[in-house]
A protein has these predicted regions:
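Conserved phosphate- and dinucleotide-binding cores of soluble alpha/beta proteins
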Residues: 1-127
Length: 127
């Protein structure tokens, strides 16, 4: 991962996908936030490209949680009593990104238009 910083030169772009787009944050695989911060420090433009199903409905925010992986994801045979934070995802503020695109449009426009129809199916799962 540290080698990525050497590619953050003038003229480079940092482009990633996402697991979900929350109102204030973007959800990524662990490590993406650090890489985005490096790109920001290097002055490299940073973009998120997402499909419409990645916009998380506001109504479901109380049910959102960053999943934690079991400690066995870090060690095959962890010592008894070992506690470790094994997050699966990072949360990155929208402000760190040059632009977030959803279905080819800026995220703010996509959200305003309600352009996240696949994610709406999640609402049926909440009592």
């Amino acid at each position: 991962d540290a080698g990525l910083a050497e590619h953050l030169r003038p003229g480079a772009l940092f482009v990633v996908g996402t697991e979900a787009i929350l109102p204030q944050q973007v959800v990524h695989r662990l490590g993406t936030r650090l890489h985005a911060a490096w790109a920001c420090l290097a002055g490299v433009p940073r973009y998120v490209l997402a499909t419409r199903d990645k916009v998380y409905p506001r109504e479901l925010l109380p049910h959102f949680a960053v999943p934690m992986l079991p400690v066995t994801e870090l060690l095959r045979q962890p010592p008894a009593g070992l506690q470790a934070e094994a997050r699966a995802f990072d949360l990155t503020p929208h402000s760190l990104w040059t632009e977030i695109f959803v279905g080819g449009a800026p995220a703010a426009l996509a959200v305003q238009k309600g352009d996240h129809r696949l994610a709406r199916g999640l609402l049926q799962l909440v009592p």
